[in-house]
Amino acid sequence: MSEKYVVTWDMLQIHARTMAKLLLPAEQWKGIIAVSRGGLVPGALLARELGIRHVDTVCIASYDHDNQRDLNVLKRAEADGEGFIVVDDLVDTGVTAKAIREMYPKAHFVTIFAKPAGRPLVDDYIIDIPQNTWIEQPWDMGVVFVSPLAGK
């Protein structure tokens, strides 16, 4: 990936609240299925904003930091998705999204970020990201002290 897009905690919360507004009224949803690991934090934020207590996970391994590899479903929520929001942080190439669509054909699939190749596979997303851009999520970064430019 040639470009990077850095997401802060504040930005993520703002984007999740924007997504929650699109998902109102909350009463239409039975629960949330968060795609582990990228969808865990957005899923928690959506659960809070929508007052949803039923939160489950589908655990899929497809990345080692910035390298996509074969899809491996480690755990799935038992349902066809009807009445559920499935949330992930991002749709990229669409490989994971296609698997999600097959597992939960009746779910409402949302992501915070969407790249062109995967965009048609989600029902809602908030931010367009170019295909060649790597997203640095806040849970993958640490906050560190940076010396002033004119520091002593």
Curated annotation (Swiss-Prot):
So which domain of life are we looking at? Bacteria
Q: Which cofactor does it need?
A: Mg(2+)
Instruction: Detail which positions bind 5-phospho-alpha-D-ribose 1-diphosphate.
Output: R37, G38, R69, D88, D89, L90, V91, D92, T93, G94, V95, T96
Alphabetized UniProt keyword annotations = Cell inner membrane, Cell membrane, Glycosyltransferase, Magnesium, Membrane, Metal-binding, Purine salvage, Transferase
The protein's annotated catalytic reaction(s) are: GMP + diphosphate = guanine + 5-phospho-alpha-D-ribose 1-diphosphate; XMP + diphosphate = xanthine + 5-phospho-alpha-D-ribose 1-diphosphate; IMP + diphosphate = hypoxanthine + 5-phospho-alpha-D-ribose 1-diphosphate
Q: Which Pfam family is an annotated match for this chain, by its short name?
A: Pribosyltran
Positions bound to xanthine: D92, I135
Please provide, alphabetically and separated by semicolons, the GO molecular function terms listed in this UniProt record: guanine phosphoribosyltransferase activity; hypoxanthine phosphoribosyltransferase activity; magnesium ion binding; xanthine phosphoribosyltransferase activity
Pathway this chain belongs to: Purine metabolism; GMP biosynthesis via salvage pathway; GMP from guanine: step 1/1; Purine metabolism; XMP biosynthesis via salvage pathway; XMP from xanthine: step 1/1
Q: Which Gene3D superfamilies match?
A: 3.40.50.2020
- For whether the record's keyword set contains ATP-binding, the answer is no
Q: Per its database record, what is this protein's job?
A: Purine salvage pathway enzyme that catalyzes the transfer of the ribosyl-5-phosphate group from 5-phospho-alpha-D-ribose 1-diphosphate (PRPP) to the N9 position of the 6-oxopurines guanine and xanthine to form the corresponding ribonucleotides GMP (guanosine 5'-monophosphate) and XMP (xanthosine 5'-monophosphate), with the release of PPi. To a lesser extent, also acts on hypoxanthine.
- Supply the name of the protein: Xanthine-guanine phosphoribosyltransferase
The species is Sodalis glossinidius (strain morsitans)
The root-end lineage is: Bacteria, Pseudomonadati, Pseudomonadota, Gammaproteobacteria, Enterobacterales
Name of the encoding gene:
gpt
